[in-house]
Amino acid sequence: MELWDLFDENRRFLYKQHNRQEPLAPGHYHVVVVVCVVNSKEEILVTLRHPAKETYANCWENTGGSVLAGETSRQGAVRELKEETGIGVSEEELMLLGSVRGISAFYDFYVVRKDVELSDIVLQENETADARWVTLEQFIQMGEDGTLAEPVYRRFRQFEEAFWKLIKNEGEERKHENL
């Protein structure tokens, strides 16, 4: 049984837990994390949702999922990335782009810079069926043509400007480190 911590509309902890199988009461929210892995070529890692998934089966997405009861957002992001791809990162490597409140959840959008070979990715059974690196242009085209899960694309577009500022600024810092 998967349990979530519950929050109010201002993200104040309600000191209650919720069983994922039950509908959320109005005014109650849980936390969902999205992790966008970006390599040194500025490509974005996407994974294919398993064909047996109830929603958005066979659609591409960024890694993500619900934060479990007792976890912080960063701990949930580290866990989800490891479970769905086998990629290990530390909480300190995660860069929070922002958070947005949805209908029943707060979505925390993280970026992590990591060079990973596709052959090293370990897909989670019944969750992910494939993985690939795509350029930003390909990612946006996937969103436009519906092969990228719609909520993933919508949330990415909300944070797109911050995403590119972060990537470009980090790249500039790395150039100066090499001088």
Ranges and model annotations:
Residues M1-V34, V38-S40:
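Acidic, metal-coordinating catalytic segment for phosphate/diphosphate chemistry
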Residues N10, N39-E42, H50, R113-L118, ...:
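Short loop segments at secondary-structure junctions
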Residues A25-G27, T55-E61, R132:
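A short, polar/proline- and glycine-enriched secondary-structure boundary/capping micro-motif
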Residues V32-G64:
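A glycine-rich, hydrophobic loop/mini-helix early in the fold
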Residues L45-V46, N62-M95:
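The catalytic Nudix box helix
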Residues A57, L96, R101-Y107, V111-L179:
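Nudix hydrolase/Nudix homology domain
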